[in-house]
């Protein structure tokens, strides 16, 4: 049985060789799964917000798309991952409630999280090879360090492997 | 004045707990009148949690739940979530709609909610939350305006992410006041979670002369 490591909200972790990184119940947050197949180093971040800029209390890097990717890459490279082989798969960024009222600042936060994640990965030259984002439902994801496969589970919207 | 959770003393937390009791008591009374059922509630608990720990306090992030969410603004701002397991939610909806209750299926049973059931639950959530906020408003003298309620049935973590993301802009921790209601003898269980935004604490405590 593979060891399962949980990644909480505004959290990030990396493992190498074997085991599974999981984050439960992604809503508007985005799960960023990075993997280097040559060294089998896997990293998973669960970000809540697109950008750390203009936010006073921004020392938790795992909370923001723009800072989480860099920190996760550093940790993975300390574990001997090779940046040029790292690829990304992302999931989440749903809109859980269909707000009918005035444009709330929360409106499309899921979509903004996805866009910021893709933009940041691009800046770090990490290709996004698969993505399951949007919709109005939650996702639980599992990244397998053995093969880099990302399992996406939902309630009522099926299970897929990216 | 900027306020952080670390500055909250035991006295402050007791005051928040007391306010929660007043709100929840009023909410339970309204719900009991609406459903003509006995409602039991526990003494509210005030909890402060890091984001990555909150799921372990409220249950696993991938647990299927039904939830009604609304925001409030005015002199104080925040979020309220009314969360039930799906079976309790189904039974609660049929209680209001006068349809037959489902006592056969298991807790993990999932068949989705009809539009009518969703709207019944939105209304129950609305009445509960509004009575709660009304009581707090009269007690503190602060004006509070609730938004329209929204219903969702999905993973606990996914539903919680909506209010938590708002918190994330100012804090790494979240403070919430939690009350559990038990409805009737059917033991329908629900959590009622109020999360005032960080600036609202000092306003609430000031209005009561505590700071």
Enumerate the predicted regions with their spans.
Chain B
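Composition-driven recognition of glycine/serine/threonine/acidic- and proline-rich low-complexity segments
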Residues: 2-26, 30-211
